[in-house]
Amino acid sequence: MLDLSKAFDSIHHETLLMKLRTLGVSDETLSWFASYLSDRQQRVRINSSLSNSLTIRHGVPQGSILGPLLFNLYINDLPSVCTTCHVESYVDDSKLYLSFSRKEIEGGLEDLKADLLRVASWCCSNRLLINPDKTKFCVFGSSKMLGQVTIPPLTFMGKDLHVVDSVKDLGVILDKRLSFNEHVDTLVSNLMGKLCMISRVRHVLDTPTLFTVINLFTLFTVINSLVFSSLFYCSSVWSGTCKGNIAKLQLVQNFAARLLSGKRKFDHITPTLKQLKLLPVSDLLYIRDAVQMYKCMNNLAPSYLSQLFTKRSQTHSFLTRNRDSLQLPRCRTALAQQSFVFRGVTIWNSLPEELRNCSSIVSFKNQLKSELLSKWLND
């Protein structure tokens, strides 16, 4: 995980304009961007004191709509400097990664080090600065593999990189065993805290106001906005985690259901969930994975996701009943079977053909949810 010091503030205007020209931006548009970037002023106010104006000679405005876009265009050629590693970037969050076996660990780390030096050289040429003290290094693998190897220190820019057991990437905590235990524990702790705060102010929502008498909908809206929206964030990445973690997430939904219904802590919650028509967390995760697969199969997802899946009809020409089903990837480990690729193929192949052939993602989601809800209520 690379850490770029003051990335947005370090953009060199002339270099950015040159890159925009290389990308085919017209002279008239370049003049507009030059005017947009140049001669910007900034001042600092502390209480009633106001500093003198200072001209900004580097960087793009943070908090603006164009800021992230211009930064992405600025680092657009970064992946091309690496010969072995893959580079993924989201605005100023960049990471280098490569795959190697246990026997190839020394060679893999040498390749990683060589590409890190190339990235450092690119950053120097583009007037960006890598902070080695905050750049993190993590090796992912199975418990067996990690227990059999010794990770040598990786030196970069004269300093040993921090070897960590987990990294946080765009809000998802990736631990070295990809168990997502830390992510789930952190998520549950955070959401339980929010629910506790909501419970303390619930009496306010229960009080009739000028605008509404029945406030159950208001309470549900608050819980949905603050809790459920975070509960399923990036779930396709981690929903293959163990049943114990799914059970922890179910406790969050149970707490929310008790708040909505006024049930006590030790009251049986399943009838309440059915009364509120709340599907269990495992079913909601299933729906989200299925919706993601629908996107992949109907060109609604990025190509790097869609190309991970192959129809059986693409591998042979036999007119079998399941020729439109997906080819299940070979997985030698339980960890691989938790991946979205394996899980997604299993889910998609299990769906009825009429459901897979839905004309829109809205109808697909509604029909799938309706079927699961009907089954859940009748159990």
Regions found by a protein language model. Name each.
Residues 129-167, 324:
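Short, conserved micro-motifs composed of acidic
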Residues 1-61, 98, 295:
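Conserved pre-catalytic core of RNA-dependent polymerases
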Residues 120-138, 245-314:
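Short, charged alpha-helical motifs in flexible N/C-terminal segments and linkers
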Residues 68-97:
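Active-site palm subdomain of RNA-directed nucleic acid polymerases
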Residues 1-3, 20, 33, 63, ...:
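Short, conserved catalytic/metal-binding micro-motifs enriched in Asp/Glu and His
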Residues 1, 44-70, 97-104, 154, ...:
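Short, conserved non-catalytic motifs in the polymerase core
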Residues 4-9, 22-25, 59-67, 103-110, ...:
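Conserved, non-catalytic sequence blocks in retroelement Pol enzymes and Pol-derived host proteins
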Residues 161-236:
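Basic, alpha-helical interaction scaffolds
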